[in-house]
Amino acid sequence: MLAVIGIVAVTQAFALLDTSDGVLATVGTVTAAGLLTCAALDGRAGLALPPAVLLAGLIGFLLHNWHPARIRPGACGSLFTGFVLASSGALVLAEAPPERAAWIALPVLATVALADAALVLVSRRRAVRPLLQDCGDHITHRLRRLRVTVPGVAVVLGLWAGAAALTGTLVYAEVLHPAFALVPVTGSAAAVVALLRIPAYVAPPVTA
């Protein structure tokens, strides 16, 4: 039951990232690379195959999804990406050797997607807005209000995801102590708190 809840939550969180050119593909690429590395560390070719195929697909897709995007994943593509990442993570977790801190390392790989989902839910709850209605209040929208460019938003979230994926992978590989997994989690929580201070439900500033 916990696995099902986790897969559904992560799938939906990644689907919500499709709000700006290149963001879902960038974050998904980084996350898939982390999962592929974790599966490869255990020498499990079968578990490494789904993230490997998704990684290749996302890299190719990103070439056409970078700003200005010529194609977009849409609901089907974003949900599929999230489902493959979530289910691959669940499979790697289930097959991980006991000495691996997989229970904390693997969820860290989805830090950016989960942070965005948390930001949206908290923001809409505080503003008494429908939780399931898109209101332009994601991380991408708030960064744009800070005048970060569209490609810049994808780069920022890619670096954020990269830091989380690197930490989670090193913890899984037993290079870092499991406590280090709290670093990206704590940092992401602080980022969410800071992003909540950026107005999301007012008209954006007019630029020339």
Per-range role (PLM):
Residues 16-24:
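RNA/tRNA-interacting regions in translation and RNA-turnover enzymes
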Residues 8-15:
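Active-site alpha-helical segments that house and flank conserved acidic catalytic motifs
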Residues 3, 7-8, 25-208:
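Alpha-helical transmembrane segments
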